Amino acid sequence: MSNETRDLYNYQYPSSFSLHEMMNLPTSNPSSYGNLPSQNGFNPSTYSFTDCLQSSPAAYESLLQKTFGLSPSSSEVFNSSIDQEPNRDVTNDVINGGACNETETRVSPSNSSSSEADHPGEDSGKSRRKRELVGEEDQISKKVGKTKKTEVKKQREPRVSFMTKSEVDHLEDGYRWRKYGQKAVKNSPYPRSYYRCTTQKCNVKKRVERSFQDPTVVITTYEGQHNHPIPTNLRGSSAAAAMFSADLMTPRSFAHDMFRTAAYTNGGSVAAALDYGYGQSGYGSVNSNPSSHQVYHQGGEYELLREIFPSIFFKQEP
């Protein structure tokens, strides 16, 4: 039994061919596969598959020519492998180049930091220059701000003050006022009151205080000029109030002062503050008592006013 098994494994078929013989079979005459002569010293029985793989391109070409009747040129066989090598080199170059560029990009911050460390004086000088420029800009802006504030202060409206003997602090002048503040006066027991005109878009202000030297004297100071006519007619003289509309008044007019003199001379009740709202100036102290008024004027101007105003205003009391 053991002998039969051994013979089974060692049995060789007579009609079988080796791999080398099959590779060297000619294609032109299939009947001659079992009887292959050696050509040019090529013995297929001694040429193994390993030798075929390790053979040179010339031997591999001759083997193909003898076996299958093919004669490919060496350029056609190895063209693909040759063409692939430059592509591989280019790919490697691109990859290597990208890596180099990334390395250079990453290294650049360290290079800049090292350059900064090598030249600390230049950086300190630049930063110092920047601080100086910022300081100069701040100084210029401060100067411009101070100049603007000074200009705003210079645009303050002119002030005109009047002294009147009266027991009442707030004298009637034909305009409506609103009290918005009160302040103590230094070296005086009497406070100072602040008023504002109630007409819209009118910025006229006035302040009223009593003199600490003579408590019977009321000092009224007007700031600005009214831009509207008198809202109400004054007591007892509507014609006089109409004559002094805003379009006929001019600052510091001597005619206005002379009219005030005529009004008091005739005993009318036109208040002395009629002209205060327009910012006119008096040439002396005005007394609320018509019998004891005191106003100074020039002779030539007085004669001119007599021709302009009705004569009834210039009648002298006996």
Swiss-Prot record:
Q: Which organism is it from?
A: Arabidopsis thaliana
Give the top-rank taxon of the lineage listed in the UniProt record for this protein: Eukaryota
Checking Pfam families in the record gives: WRKY (PF03106)
Task: Please give the PROSITE patterns that the UniProt record associates with this protein.
Answer: WRKY
Q: Where is the composition biased (Polar residues)?
A: 74-84, 106-115
Region Disordered: list its residue ranges: 74-158
Q: Does the keyword Nucleus apply?
A: yes
User: Residue ranges under compositional bias (Basic and acidic residues)?
Assistant: 116-126, 148-158
The terms describing its cellular component in GO are:
nucleus
Q: What does this chain do?
A: Transcription factor. Interacts specifically with the W box (5'-(T)TGAC[CT]-3'), a frequently occurring elicitor-responsive cis-acting element.
Q: Which residues bind DNA?
A: 166-231
Q: Name one GO molecular function term.
A: sequence-specific DNA binding
PANTHER family for this protein? WRKY TRANSCRIPTION FACTOR 28, WRKY TRANSCRIPTION FACTOR PROTEIN 1-RELATED
Listed A to Z, the keywords are: DNA-binding, Nucleus, Transcription, Transcription regulation
Provide the family line: Belongs to the WRKY group II-c family.
Give the record's GO biological process terms.
Answer: positive regulation of leaf senescence; regulation of cell fate specification
Question: Where is the protein found, in the record's own terms?
Answer: Nucleus
Q: What protein is this chain from?
A: WRKY transcription factor 28
